């Protein structure tokens, strides 16, 4: 019976400790517009890549550091940024749970043709052309640039792990729409032969 009570107490201690990454119990601090890289965009313009970083300020981080979550916005590789839609919410929600979080911008844009896509919507009986077309290769290039920039953000954060108290062996990527594709490519595309 004594062994059973000890096992139950140990199990309860593990459950209580596991709540650290679940409950939104921490106060947070956020630093905006940190430059994590300088790049050339699709049109040859030089750009600075920015990120927002958020972390708990009243926690006791593990000796190895906090888990890191990188949030990547969507927008069809043409629009969006680190301050819109879901990434700001993910940034604060996960920091309140004990994570160090970052929301990143990545290079947007691609060359478009003059051809238009008919969206099967008619205005007063006339088909409406709602989008300009891009060559498929432009979508691949936009996707690849996004992945390169996300990997740059990841390198920046790992190189600053001590400063932001990050565990470089405990990293998560999350994205919406195009950001989801960028997150997947960042995690899994690691061989040059896999380049689209």
Predicted features along the sequence, with ranges:
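Bacterial Sec-dependent N-terminal signal peptides
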Residues: 1-22
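Serine-hydrolase catalytic-loop signature spanning alpha/beta hydrolases and amidase-signature enzymes
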Residues: 76-79, 101, 156
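Short beta-strand element of the alpha/beta-hydrolase
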Residues: 63-76
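Alpha/beta-hydrolase active-site loop
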Residues: 119-162
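Alpha/beta-hydrolase active-site loop signature
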Residues: 76, 108-110
